[in-house]
Amino acid sequence: MSLVVAIKKDGVVYLGADTRITKGERVASNLTEEELKIHRMGKCLIGTAGTVSNIQLMTSHPEWFEQNGKPLTKKFIVQNVVSKYYDLVKNMDKLEVEEQSSDSPKSGCSFLVTDGEKLFMILDDFEVIELSSYGQVGCTDEIAMTFLLNDGDRHEPNEMILKALRTSAYRNDGVGAPFVLINTRDNKFEIVEE
């Protein structure tokens, strides 16, 4: 399970994620940068939640995020990231389709993408949404969203992210500390032990 939370404030995007990894009955945390749920993809940061094999299909292609001086836009993400990701997931027969559902196929993953100026969410049905102030993907994302909506701007961004992550961890065993923080100004990971 995973939870990634992002807050956009004063021209900086702050991201935070849990480090808990669950596989069956096994619970662990991995603190190597390659295994964190926030990845550097060129000049972008991407937060990931969902099916690990499909996340790896996205994070193994940083070239999809090369903007060549162009701003990060919804159109750019749809044309250069989502279309290639969809084709790859489809060609590898990893689309999740419910038999008795008219819903479109899903990837089983959601992503938060930022270049520091803009913040986007890529949903598991490949829809792209531009976010104005904050977003969250993953397990207990509704709990995190409720916390962010109710707590508003009363705290600095990293404190809000940590409170949302802690509240979610309290409510669900799939989310847990230590937590990792990063922002687009400093671009350095910080591990927060509990």
Model-inferred region functions:
Residues 189-194:
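Patatin-like phospholipase
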